Regions:
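Flexible, acidic/glycine-enriched loop-and-adjacent beta/alpha segments
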Residues: 1-34
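Non-catalytic, structured segments within soluble enzyme domains
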Residues: 30, 34-165
Length: 165
């Protein structure tokens, strides 16, 4: 959600892009914001219905009226699903890397961030590594990390705990 701090719960640009893509191509593309995912994870359900999506949009707008963006992000990070029964960044750090969140490096954080897209797929380390590179590239492109941080994190093997044990 590259415009998380700029929108008020619903990213109109992503929504229009998603609708056009879904109407004019054979592929589907989502437009959920972090705010909408918090709604789905905590307030509604995983149903893939238009009714739920509209409810998530409404809830996201309401959350932005009563919560700061950092509070919404914290709710997301504490409840996101990462596969292997790991809900939240703290549990993900423990399950995948055997560490506390505060001990994770940039490469590990990017790998966890990438896993939220499709946890079942990214349980496989090779797939998780591919997704991690995409996350790091986007972070670099948006100016969240420097050239040096990008190169170092991209070069990190980032092994899962199960590969070390």
């Amino acid at each position: 959600d590259e415009r998380f701090y700029k929108h008020k719960g619903v990213d109109v640009i992503s929504l229009v892009r998603s609708v056009l893509n879904n109407v004019f191509t054979d592929t589907t593309q989502g437009a959920s914001t972090i705010d909408m995912q918090v709604s789905k994870n905590l307030l509604t359900s995983n149903d893939k219905t238009m009714k739920r999506k509209i409810r998530d949009m409404y809830n996201a707008k309401q959350m932005n009226k009563i919560m700061t963006k950092d509070e919404i992000l914290e709710a997301y990070l504490n409840n996101m699903y990462l596969g292997k029964d790991a809900y939240g960044a703290a549990k993900g750090a423990e399950v995948y890397f055997g560490k506390k969140v505060s001990e994770l490096n940039l490469a590990e954080c990017a790998m966890l961030a990438g896993m939220t897209n499709n946890p079942a797929r990214y349980i496989d380390h090779g797939e998780a590594k591919k997704r991690q590179v995409i996350v790091l590239y986007k972070m670099h492109q948006l100016g969240y990390i420097t050239d040096k941080e990008y190169r170092i994190a991209k070069a990190d093997d980032t092994p899962f705990k199960s590969e070390i044990d």
